[in-house]
Structure formats: C-alpha cells, structure tokens
C-alpha cells in the first residue's frame, strides 16, 4: 500500500513504532520524524524508590531511533535538552512543538453546563484533575500540597472541590 500511495513523511510515536518506521523510511526514501513522548533514560534518572528501571532494549531502541530520525519532536525545551544530552541527538534536528488544544475549535458541543451534567458534576463545583503516570517527576504531590494549601486558606472551598487523580505506573 505504501508503494502505491507514497507519503511525504513518516511520523512515528514511541520507540517501538520508531523501530518499525526506520526500515520503511529508509526503503522508501521518506524522511522519518519521531516523537518520543517518554524516554527511558529520563525515566531511569527519576525512579522512585522500588521502581523498576526501563529495560536496556528500550534504551538501545530509543538510541537507534534518535540516530535514524531526520527530525525529532519534543514537547518542551527540557525534553529537547534531554534528547541532545542523553541521546546525543543533533540539536538542529530537534524541534519543540508544545502540545495543546485550540479551544475555539474543540469545545463541549452543548456547553460547559451540559458537559458537567453528562459526567455528573455539580454545576457549582470546582474540579481539578491530574492525568498521568503516578511518578515523582510528574508532580502529583505538587497538586496534593497545593490543594491542601488552597483549602487551608479558603476552607469554604472544601465543600465544592472535586479532585481527580487519574493514572498508574508506567508500562
């Protein structure tokens, strides 16, 4: 199918798809753009006590993908710096593209009140949500400490505050 419908670029996400994309990009002479999303070396540098490090096969795979990619997309300046310092990525090949949502385009169709009703949230509640891996470098404890501070200064918020922490270990 790729030979009949040529593409201008292959954009892989995560190291496993990057490994699959590498020979395809080479065979078809198509530039490979890769987004890591997470990096084993970064995760291994930030392990909490008792956490299992990412396997060496992942580190090796990520290193190979970084070397093969024509361009690397990082979500933040810190992520870009990690690609350069930990994986020896060429700085000229690393581009920072911050993730985000265009709120003028992507809004609850029926409005905020209807969306709250659909998911069972009180219209007067204040909702704070953390979504991500529950790991120290993701900062869930910052949220918890901040909420404790908020409630200590504004006790009236306690009755209307809904805090969601959604996530688990990586893997």
Region locations from a protein language model:
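A short helix/loop element that forms part of the nucleotide-sugar donor recognition site in Leloir-type
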Residues: 107-121
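Active-site proximal beta-strand in glycosyltransferases
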Residues: 25-45, 73
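Conserved donor-binding/catalytic core segment of Leloir-type glycosyltransferases
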Residues: 122-138, 144-148, 163-164
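Membrane-proximal helix-turn-helix segments that form the acceptor-binding/catalytic region
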Residues: 40, 53-72
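A short beta-strand/loop micro-motif in the catalytic core of glycosyltransferases
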Residues: 10-11, 67-76, 95
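Glycosyltransferase donor-sugar binding loop
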Residues: 101, 159-171
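Short N-terminal targeting/anchoring amphipathic segment
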Residues: 2-17, 21, 30-33
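Carbohydrate-associated surface elements
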Residues: 78, 100
């Amino acid at each position: 199918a790729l030979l009949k419908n040529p593409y201008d670029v292959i954009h892989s996400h995560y190291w496993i798809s990057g490994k699959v994309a590498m020979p395809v990009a080479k065979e078809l002479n198509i530039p490979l753009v890769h987004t890591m999303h997470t990096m084993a070396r970064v995760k291994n540098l930030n392990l909490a006590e008792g956490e299992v490090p990412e396997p060496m096969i992942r580190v090796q795979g990520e290193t190979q993908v970084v070397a093969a990619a024509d361009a690397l997309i990082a979500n933040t300046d810190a992520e870009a710096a990690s690609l350069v310092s930990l994986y020896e990525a060429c700085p000229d090949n690393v581009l920072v593209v911050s993730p985000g949502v265009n709120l003028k385009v992507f809004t609850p169709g029926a409005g905020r009140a209807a969306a709250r009703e659909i998911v069972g949230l009180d219209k007067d509640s204040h909702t704070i949500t953390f979504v991500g891996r529950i790991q120290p470098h993701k900062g869930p404890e910052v949220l918890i400490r901040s909420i404790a501070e908020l409630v200590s200064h504004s006790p009236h918020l306690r009755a209307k505050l809904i805090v969601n922490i959604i996530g688990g270990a990586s893997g």
